[in-house]
Amino acid sequence: DYSDNALNAFRLWCERKYGTIENLNKAWGTTFWGQEMNGFHEVLIPRFMGADSMVNPGQKLDFERFGNDMLLDFYKAERDAIAEICPDKPFTTNFMVSTDQCCMDYADWAEEVDFVSNDHYFHEGESHIDELFCSDALMDSLALGKPWYVMEHSTSAVQWKPLNARKRKGETVRDSIAHVAMGADAINFFQWRASAFG
């Protein structure tokens, strides 16, 4: 998020990562367009300022890494709290590995779950099956030879994409078989029909 708490946590994350503001300035290339900072208190969260604006790519990448680390820490805290009550239960969480959504460092996440699991949704167009194979190959590599699951796989259209195309006849079966052929040990469906809201 973009709250003061997130800003302060991002500044601390940057300080731990770089040690000195000079190291951060060098890594982000802040000499360009006079972006140099004099202290970590000057670090800001990257913000989109309009169609012609530019966000420092090093700053943006580090903010993505920061977000990954914060979410992973939150997952581990939840997992550990539940494990105290249910120590014999396996733990996982839904990855979102696809060619248009993979902004998390799932190699780090894979070490923290008992088995990896993915949400995979239909990509309309000719490249859909190629995208499915690419996503599943990445999941299979993250699983390191252990079972992995497709936690969410739609039967047809969803309600949350800008354009919500329906699957054609046979595509749900084809995609399910393709996931299994690529190594998935379980296929779960969500949702049977697109929600009316949300």
Indicate residue ranges for each PLM-predicted region.
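Polysaccharide-binding and catalytic clefts of secreted carbohydrate-active enzymes
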Residues: 1-115, 122, 126-132
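Hydrophobic targeting/anchoring helices
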Residues: 92-198
